[in-house]
Amino acid sequence: MREETAEQPAPLRSGLTTGSCATATSLAAARLLLEGSNADAVQIILPKGKQVQMRLEFCRHTADGAEAGTIKDAGDDPDVTHGALLYSRVRLTPEPGIRFIAGQGVGTVTRPGLVLAVGEPAINPIPRRMIGEHLQRLAEERAYPGGFEVTVNVEGGAELALKTMNPRLGILGGLSILGTSGIVRPFSCAAYIASIHQGIDVAKTNGYLHIAACTGNASEDTMRRVYELPEIALIEMGDFVGAVLKHLRKVPVDKLSLCGGFGKISKLAAGHMDLHSRHSSIDLSQLAQWAADAGADPALQQAIRQANTSQQALAMASAAGVALGDAVCRHALDFARSVVPPQVQVEVFAIDRQGGIVGHAGGFQ
């Protein structure tokens, strides 16, 4: 009998960014106008020099130019734009250069603090550069002296944008056209981390020097209740507390409130920068030691070590009058302070599932 072996998981598949899609569709439409060539695929060069071929859904003339579309393939990354139709409309202009327009489903910047000026379409700098380089190369090949007007569209983008951080960042009406390498790495969460950085930038640029970084909706509600902070000062960090703390080295604010569920704050207290269960776990033995430091007797310490969850450990400590929540927040505070610049005042809140505060450490002068 043949011995069975465990099936090896297939490697995760990378995808292409919305910036790559916009580049490919803009190039295809421009080629149709300058060369008359109607293709079902187009090849582009990514920022690091890799060449990729992208399939087109259509490439056709319009009343005053041409348009081409492709389906966004994010590979195995859980990207909100995966499967969306992205299409670019190109019009030739007598003046050299490229003018970008936010079409259907692409947002417009309405707040200062982002890399793009207020009023600009939310097509980020590297996608703009990619599109510009490809169209300039085409213009030189065809000895075309004029310029291009490029309108980028994402079908259903306005609805998809509501699932992103764009409304909070002041990018209204649709999605952002993103990408730095042109490639989407599965589960890299690069776009989410970038939105955290942008949220901090926008808050500071608009004069909000006290921000609250929260792991979810319940912690945001807690911070609204405690401080009445506006939405622009609330940073939805999810599990990526490291993205907040490290960015504050470059863009410091005066005051930082960190708020999250007790379990996630316990991970922060243990020195974890990524609070997702894939990357960090709750150390019940460590919780027992912190409980001991807060006055827990040996029996309670042992019970905490054997607890099923951090919430159960917290409940047992609370019943015994041991302030485990505060102890955990103090350790989380110490770790956060070790990362951010010394001028940033920090405090930490831990909450239960109902949003009640079960621990706090730190404060502001």
UniProtKB/Swiss-Prot annotation:
**UniProt GO MF annotations:** cobalt-precorrin-5B C1-methyltransferase activity
Q: Which reaction(s) does the protein catalyse, per the Swiss-Prot or TrEMBL entry?
A: Co-precorrin-5B + S-adenosyl-L-methionine = Co-precorrin-6A + S-adenosyl-L-homocysteine
Q: Does the keyword Hydrolase apply?
A: no
Pathway, per UniProt?
Cofactor biosynthesis; adenosylcobalamin biosynthesis; cob(II)yrinate a,c-diamide from sirohydrochlorin (anaerobic route): step 6/10
**One Gene Ontology term from the biological process aspect of the record:** anaerobic cobalamin biosynthetic process
Q: What's the Enzyme Commission number for this chain?
A: 2.1.1.195
Q: List the transmembrane segments.
A: none
> What is any Pfam family matched here?
CbiD
EC class of the enzyme, as a word: transferase
Ordered alphabetically, the record's keywords are: Cobalamin biosynthesis, Methyltransferase, S-adenosyl-L-methionine, Transferase
Disulfide bonds, paired cysteine numbers: none
**Where on the tree of life does the source sit, at the highest rank?**
Bacteria
Instruction: List the SUPFAM superfamilies.
Output: CbiD-like
Give the family from UniProt. Belongs to the CbiD family.
This chain belongs to which protein, by name?
Answer: Cobalt-precorrin-5B C(1)-methyltransferase
Origin species, per record, is Pseudomonas fluorescens (strain ATCC BAA-477 / NRRL B-23932 / Pf-5)
Source taxonomy: Bacteria, Pseudomonadati, Pseudomonadota, Gammaproteobacteria, Pseudomonadales
